Amino acid sequence: MSFSARSRRQRLQLEEAYQREMIFKMHTLDLVREGVNKRSPAFVRAFTSAKEASLDLDRYMQAHSRVGRVEQNARALAQRVEAQAAVGEILDRHRRFLHPDFIDNFDSREDSIVEREERLGDVLSDINCDGGGGEVGDPQEWLGHEDEALLMRWMLEEAPRVSTRIAADPHSPRSTCPAPRKAPEDARCGARKPGEVNNYTPSAQPRSQETTVDHLASPDEGTRLGDRTRDLEHHSTAPMRTHPNVLASERRRLGVVHQREKSSESQESATRSKAIVGQEDQKWLGGIPPLSDEELQVDMGIPTMNGPIYPDYHRTA
């Protein structure tokens, strides 16, 4: 009988003994619940059968556990023998590593290899295989100084140019505010025919005066502002402009433009008058002495994320 057939037969015997023991035991307990006398032949027969089935189950379980334990020990020994055989085979295949002179031979061969490797490096340095100007450079740095300078020049040429129309103070928040976008020509000059609804775009809606005034104008914008003023006057007097809301918006824009022109002219006149007055015209009439220009200047410091940083001469002053 093979090992698998014998193992299957043992499992079936164990399962049969377990089922017989459960059946006779449940029958005995049912008789007890019904109140049958323990001297009754039915109870005696049921109890005796249940006891024999229980003893048979114990014997089968002990035999099965013994067989299983022996099988486990045999498998463990077989694994040890197989491992020993595998290790012996590996050692036989690499028995040259176990030779007494292997370590000395290995060290001498390693020294010879290192010496030849250094000699190869010396030959490479002598003939200069990298094609440089006399020195062997790093093979990873294939860009020279001239190449780096040329690349930097290309990067600077492709960088976006800084606009000149910014505020005088580079740290002013107005220098970072985007300029208000102009309304499209078709939206400003759009007209409706008689009997049609004026479907003007949202870009033609009136803008707030604060948005228009916040855009700082430089002195060299006088010509452009004059051209835009004439353009606005032309569009405001055109016969096609009939919508009252759009007309009021253009009038407000025209007023803001005139106000900006007047403010720029007043600033230019004040600058010219200040330039005419010299230091010799200022006289001290007594009392508190006047402050010098250096004392009147306010140093904003160097702006950082943690606040302004002042140079060392402020601390020593």
Swiss-Prot record:
Tell me the compartments it is located in.
Virion tegument; Host cytoplasm; Host nucleus
Query: Does Lyase show up as a keyword for this record?
Result: no
Looking at the record, which segments are called Disordered? 166-291
Q: What does this protein do?
A: Contributes to the nuclear transport of the viral transcriptional activator VP16 during the early phase of infection. Therefore, participates indirectly in the regulation of the immediate-early gene expression. Additionally, seems to be important for efficient nuclear targeting of capsids.
Q: Where is the composition biased (Polar residues)?
A: 198-211
Where does the record place Basic and acidic residues bias?
A: 182-195, 217-236, 249-265
The scientific name of the source species is Equine herpesvirus 1 (strain Ab4p) (EHV-1)
> What superkingdom does the record give?
Viruses
Q: What is this protein called?
A: Tegument protein UL14 homolog
Protein family (similarity comment): Belongs to the alphaherpesvirinae HHV-1 UL14 protein family.
Recorded GO cellular component terms are: host cell cytoplasm; host cell nucleus; viral tegument
UniProt keywords (A-Z) are: Host cytoplasm, Host nucleus, Virion, Virion tegument
